[in-house]
Amino acid sequence: MKDDKNKSRLLFVPSGGLGNRLRAIVSAVQLSEATGTALRIVWFKDWGMGAEWREIFKPMKHYALREASLLDSLVYDRPRKRNFFVPKLFQNLLFEQRIDEYDVTPLKRKNFDFCAWAKGRNSYMSCYQDFGAVDNSLYSDLFSPTDEIEQRIARNLEQLGDAPIG
């Protein structure tokens, strides 16, 4: 068995509304593929996105995405005033480096190299936006709505009729 100590790992927490989370996940997937970094995604149901992953999407085929547990809320949630920044204490112990969601925009403005940052390290990142060039074909590869959501979409399309405006 190979020594796994030097393997790159990224625990990724997407945040914001659905569109923001999907853009952030696509960026994290591209980062993972570009660097050979093992990607784990933890999905938090919160005020920004009031649904669990499994309520809207089928499981991802090639990436580990799981719903957040109560323990995850303590350890992996985004550090904020309302959780007294407690998760940051655990994250500083568990990860070599971390990027919080509010750090991403300033880093992008400085042309930060996210790939160099992630490669060879055990990292944590929370994010609500894309970071890096996004391959739009990944959206359909990664995100497959549940059958119930597909049926709701079909019903809504039928109601639009033949001449929708907008």
PLM regions and their residue ranges:
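Juxtamembrane luminal stem/stalk of type II transmembrane Golgi/ER carbohydrate-processing enzymes
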Residues: 1-9
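Short, hydrophobic/glycine-enriched beta-strand segments
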Residues: 8-15, 165-166
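A short, glycine/small-residue-rich beta-strand->loop->alpha-helix junction that serves as a flexible
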Residues: 14-23
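Short amphipathic alpha-helix
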Residues: 24-31
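A short beta-strand-loop structural module common to alpha/beta enzyme folds
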Residues: 38-48
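Secretory-pathway luminal glycosyltransferase catalytic domains
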Residues: 52-166
